[in-house]
Amino acid sequence: MNELSVNDAFDDIEIESFDFIWEEWEEYKGDVPLWQHIFCGSIAGLMEHVFMYPLDTLKTYFQTNGHMKYNMIYDNCNTINNNNNNIYRGNNSSYKNTCDKNYKDMNNHRNMQTFKRNFCSSTNCDKCIINNFCKYKTNCYNVMAALHTKNNRYIHNIAEPLKNMANYKINTTNNNNVNNIINNNNNNNKKKSRNIFSYPSHTKQYRNVTYVVNKKMQQNLFNNYISNKCINDPFCCRTKTNVLNMKKDIHKFCHLSKEKYNNVFYQNDTYHPNIYGRKRKTLCRNKNNINLFKNHVHKKYCHSLDDQICHSKIKEDMRNLQNFKNYTCAKNMKRHLYSTVPFFNLKNKGNKNITLPYKEIRSKYILKNGYKSMYQRNAGYYKNLIKMQSAKKNRHQLLALRKCLMSEKKYTIIKNEPFIIRKKKNMRNEYFIGNMKGRCIINTSLNSYTLKRNCLDYHHFVNNLKNICYSIMNICYNIKNTILINPSLPINNNNNNNNNTKMDTFIKLINKCLYNNNAHKIDHKILLSNYLNLFKHTNYSYYYILNNFLKNNAPCTSRKNEWNIFSNFINVLKNKIITNNVDYIRNPNVRRNQILRNNYLYSFLRNYNKNLKRNTHMILNKLTSFKYSIPYIKNKYSNVLINNINTNNNTYSNRNVLNSIRYNNIYKNIMHPIFFPGYYNTIHFRYYNYFSRIIDDKDKGKNKNIINISTKRNNCSSIIRNNLSNLYKGVNVVVLGCIPAHALYFSTFEYSKKYFSRMTSNNSSLKMNNRNISTVSNDIKSEKSNFKLYDLNYFSIAVSGFLATLVHDLIITPIDTLKQRIQLGINKNSKDSLKLLKQNGIRSLYLSLPITLLMNIPYQIIMICTNEKMKKIYFEYICGLNTQNNKKNMENKVIDKVHDETRNQDNIGKDIKNDTYNMDKNGTFLRNQEMINKENRIYNSGALEKHVTSQEKEDKILQSVKQENVSSNNDIVNFYEGQSIYNNDAHNIIRDDINKMTHKNLENNIDNTINSNESDVNRIDNMTNDMNKECDIFSINKNNNSTVLYDQIMKRLEMNSSNKNFSLNFHDKIIRQESSPFEKENYNMNLKNIWIDNYKNDFFNKPFNHITSYFVCAGIGGGIAAVLTNPLDVIKTRIQTECFQTKGFNFFRIVSNIYYREGMRSFFKGSLARMALCIPASAVSWGTYETMKRFFKINFNTT
């Protein structure tokens, strides 16, 4: 089909009780005005966005990982704001006002889980919500964020946080234990005040320090702060050159011998000797070039790249070097850096001064444009080399992380390797949880697990960190097999002096289970507290611990399943064992080593107060280093580390991140335990505190339900449950944008399809397939026709959809960006969103336009093509247009009847039909003498005596018939010539056919006129039979297009020549009289509607069901298009929510980040939600538009 739609094909269908006319593409001619398209499109867009807005909100949540992570920042800010002794409130009033205001603003969105790690994660900009509250903690967070990015191009963001941190003063105390910290809370004499950058007393650090350098070598605020502090010192800064060098790159000026291994150019092909020894690996292809460059850069006591290249003032710097080495420059730099970075240090047990380790990263040198003249050939090469060095440092950390997690050195992680833990199908030692009768409780959280491999080696238990996890899981497994809970047993607790009653009860419970309430002990009992030394940082590098303790290759596993087993067991202990006294029933089949493993748990629990609980308080103190760490201890359940446990680690557990250096960009989620610098401590520390929270009895009634391990689904359900209005946030912005967008969308679509329809060569909607030709007589053949819709022209549909989508997205893209940011809580309301235009400009609202077009263009094309195809199928097969096979027997009967009646025709009628008439060029008929003689014979015959009239009356009748036929003939020919349906070659054929048809029709009209007073029905049958014969003979030599044209012309002539008071039965079709389309010289011809009664479906004949087809077909098209374009929609949503304040984005980098961070499945996040959104949205939009347009056409546009 060369048309763009199938709507024109349905003009040949008439529905009873409802004038349901499908509009033809080529028949607009002002039929539907422009304002009606705009009005209908506006109503359709409003209906779509308002009713579907809740589903769109949920889709946005699913595609952005479902929720805003890290709610502990809220708890942190809440704790600080509720603390009356807050150090910032007393010393800085501006902080008080800012923090209070920002906290209230963010707390309004708390129900929506509005906080995300960083909404501008692509650039780590400082205008995100994360930088607007909890000043010091936020600045520490930003420092950590800058130190954990893939490249050092984000490191310039460290300057502003350090500047903010330098404005505050903190109170510190030198305590030896936790009790001193609590006792000193009321002792103001022991408080010591110092600046945040001042140097606290600390133990000697053996790790070398490398400092952060700005990417473009701009003057770093942090370096300025240090240089200004030392500017008056005669030993440090004797000349202005030293000050300038310090401002440029202070750590290069302090180029000590111990730090040479941290220099990028020096360590181009070697590992750090303190970590990996002297093992060398080549990273550069051309080693001679890099060595040549080192000779230029690394001369003896050369301190800055600028001085080295310029070869100036080297002697002056050398004279000042020794004095500068012996003074405080390098030491102060070390102290400042590690005193500002929060880091876990489990080694400190309270007997030494508080120390905070630091993050070690490599410096980055950038060659300026002015240096390219000397090193024009190699400047770009060395730039890339610097990036490789930075990536290599990250790779070293990944290698250490891999050893810590997987206990292997050379083998990569196999993605689909079977888990070590598997469910035991047939378990002999069954366990029961229930009442005294032993009735088994279904749906319990206890599950039977066993180890697939025997990974326990008690002699080398300390040498393998993984065995700690395995032993804990075996403990869980064996206790589940040996404990039978009996709630009927009484609780025996005689120790009333101990405050920690629940802990004592639990220990006694385990003692009863392990030793049957006896006092004997096992000699070879291993204390789990000794293994905690593996989690501590030592004075030397932690790589040393990993290389010495992680030598055994343990099989790979999934940490997610391991910890799920452990957490399930802990929940059982909380819900069953602690709340009910337990009687020990020892199974004689239990092996001896199982008792030993149970003893591990007992040892661990017995040393609970002495080890884990104390470390909890100390780590909190070391994390903050300030006085307000005490409220964390008092209000422990508001603590970040205890109240928020991240168990959603499945994005990393089965992925090999060490195959390529470019995998370093997955470390955007810096608070994730895998990516956090203290991961070696925090991953175990978190779960141990998880264990302690369940066992500890403090605030039992208030905090028994505080364990909130939130997931994406729980978050969305909590949003709906807490406040349904959250699903409609931002709907006012969408209403203002969807009305003009959809009005232009539908108007552009309608007029573009009208334009392309005129360019097609064939505008006919229906074609008649020539099938089943049967013989009526020896000379006449009758053709049975099969109606069928032409095929769709998908190219024209695609072009129309493309133009409409382009206009639509230019308007809706900025609205969609603002809408999604309001949905996620990034902006509070529409006014707050509009304020961003002043800061970022309107260009920031169109960042996602390319990806939006890339998504919407294929979506709209697929949806429109599917919609048109479904409507074609609906009206072809359901409505019976293509069911001619069912009519076969009826047509044969009609043809036989016509054949019999033909033989019985009157001879006079045959003579009249054989007469010929001449037609001139203008279409007028000429009478010859032979015709006049025949008329005289007919007039004088006895058979026509009753119908004889005067010659004048006959002349008047003939003249009227000739005028009517001539005018009708000219109108038809002029109409089809004006429409340019056929080529010029076809015009002559059509005119000849019309002349023949008009000649035969004139003869029949003469018969009807002469015999008007005769009430003989056979005359009418004869006339009909003659017309049928001519139609059959005519259709044999015609193609499908001319057949349709001939059929329409015949119907028109039948109406003009027949009486208006009766209908003519023609081939079993009911031809209904319509108003004349030729009035007032209007050539917009409305062809008559045909409905086949034998194939009419009563159900689909109802107007409501036909209107429903609009919605059903559009909904099917929207669902198919939604699934196919969902990956592009995910990318669009990420760009709109995460790259708002950037000047641009790299499409392939964003796609690679999503893939390597979350896997291929992340591209299909929210597919079901998007289908649930797009199916009703498309149905409502297109169904409403088509229904409204049809309403206007029937009621306002008909004449």
From Swiss-Prot:
<feature type="transmembrane region" description="Helical">
    <location>
        <begin position="32"/>
        <end position="52"/>
    </location>
</feature>
<feature type="transmembrane region" description="Helical">
    <location>
        <begin position="730"/>
        <end position="750"/>
    </location>
</feature>
<keyword id="KW-1133">Transmembrane helix</keyword>
<feature type="glycosylation site" description="N-linked (GlcNAc...) asparagine">
    <location>
        <position position="715"/>
    </location>
</feature>
<feature type="glycosylation site" description="N-linked (GlcNAc...) asparagine">
    <location>
        <position position="1041"/>
    </location>
</feature>
<keyword id="KW-0406">Ion transport</keyword>
<feature type="glycosylation site" description="N-linked (GlcNAc...) asparagine">
    <location>
        <position position="723"/>
    </location>
</feature>
<keyword id="KW-0813">Transport</keyword>
<feature type="transmembrane region" description="Helical">
    <location>
        <begin position="795"/>
        <end position="815"/>
    </location>
</feature>
<feature type="glycosylation site" description="N-linked (GlcNAc...) asparagine">
    <location>
        <position position="772"/>
    </location>
</feature>
<feature type="glycosylation site" description="N-linked (GlcNAc...) asparagine">
    <location>
        <position position="763"/>
    </location>
</feature>
<keyword id="KW-0472">Membrane</keyword>
<keyword id="KW-0325">Glycoprotein</keyword>
<feature type="glycosylation site" description="N-linked (GlcNAc...) asparagine">
    <location>
        <position position="922"/>
    </location>
</feature>
<protein>
    <recommendedName>
        <fullName>Putative mitoferrin</fullName>
    </recommendedName>
</protein>
<keyword id="KW-0812">Transmembrane</keyword>
<comment type="function">
    <text>Putative iron transporter.</text>
</comment>
<dbReference type="InterPro" id="IPR023395">
    <property type="entry name" value="Mt_carrier_dom_sf"/>
</dbReference>
<feature type="glycosylation site" description="N-linked (GlcNAc...) asparagine">
    <location>
        <position position="326"/>
    </location>
</feature>
<feature type="glycosylation site" description="N-linked (GlcNAc...) asparagine">
    <location>
        <position position="708"/>
    </location>
</feature>
<keyword id="KW-0677">Repeat</keyword>
<feature type="glycosylation site" description="N-linked (GlcNAc...) asparagine">
    <location>
        <position position="1022"/>
    </location>
</feature>
<dbReference type="GO" id="GO:0015093">
    <property type="term" value="F:ferrous iron transmembrane transporter activity"/>
</dbReference>
<dbReference type="Pfam" id="PF00153">
    <property type="entry name" value="Mito_carr"/>
</dbReference>
<keyword id="KW-0496">Mitochondrion</keyword>
<feature type="glycosylation site" description="N-linked (GlcNAc...) asparagine">
    <location>
        <position position="499"/>
    </location>
</feature>
<feature type="repeat" description="Solcar 2">
    <location>
        <begin position="1109"/>
        <end position="1191"/>
    </location>
</feature>
<feature type="glycosylation site" description="N-linked (GlcNAc...) asparagine">
    <location>
        <position position="914"/>
    </location>
</feature>
<feature type="glycosylation site" description="N-linked (GlcNAc...) asparagine">
    <location>
        <position position="649"/>
    </location>
</feature>
<feature type="transmembrane region" description="Helical">
    <location>
        <begin position="845"/>
        <end position="865"/>
    </location>
</feature>
<dbReference type="GO" id="GO:0005743">
    <property type="term" value="C:mitochondrial inner membrane"/>
</dbReference>
<dbReference type="GO" id="GO:0048250">
    <property type="term" value="P:iron import into the mitochondrion"/>
</dbReference>
<feature type="glycosylation site" description="N-linked (GlcNAc...) asparagine">
    <location>
        <position position="1013"/>
    </location>
</feature>
<feature type="transmembrane region" description="Helical">
    <location>
        <begin position="1111"/>
        <end position="1131"/>
    </location>
</feature>
<feature type="glycosylation site" description="N-linked (GlcNAc...) asparagine">
    <location>
        <position position="268"/>
    </location>
</feature>
<feature type="glycosylation site" description="N-linked (GlcNAc...) asparagine">
    <location>
        <position position="1056"/>
    </location>
</feature>
<keyword id="KW-0408">Iron</keyword>
<feature type="glycosylation site" description="N-linked (GlcNAc...) asparagine">
    <location>
        <position position="92"/>
    </location>
</feature>
<feature type="glycosylation site" description="N-linked (GlcNAc...) asparagine">
    <location>
        <position position="171"/>
    </location>
</feature>
<feature type="glycosylation site" description="N-linked (GlcNAc...) asparagine">
    <location>
        <position position="208"/>
    </location>
</feature>
<feature type="repeat" description="Solcar 1">
    <location>
        <begin position="792"/>
        <end position="873"/>
    </location>
</feature>
<feature type="glycosylation site" description="N-linked (GlcNAc...) asparagine">
    <location>
        <position position="965"/>
    </location>
</feature>
